[in-house]
């Protein structure tokens, strides 16, 4: 059973993710008391207990959270802070099998965001369609 900590669980994104994860019997969701949400020591303790931490924070706070986590658990970042960072895997499994494999084995996965995700998937679909049409005309 995997243990999950949502850093930023009181915000909209954190609430939505927590709601979905609570429905899963194969996961344990760690929670932090409201008065400890900004306490670095309390958060660091939860990072140590977690298998995976989901960062639902503003960019600067997400960067700081990575320092608190200090490589003790896998990180999924919902902010824009690490989207193009070379140490993070771009979390778009629908892209291709290589992307799925990279995400599955990564310690740090960035959220692609809704606008980039929509564009990339549309562009990839269009490119595949055009390639298929070209193949048929040869």
Role assignments for model-derived ranges:
Residues 28-37:
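A short beta-strand-loop structural module common to alpha/beta enzyme folds
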Residues 53-54:
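N-terminal Rossmann-like NAD(P) cofactor-binding module of classical short-chain dehydrogenase/reductase
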Residues 61-77:
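Rossmann-fold NAD(P) dinucleotide-binding segment
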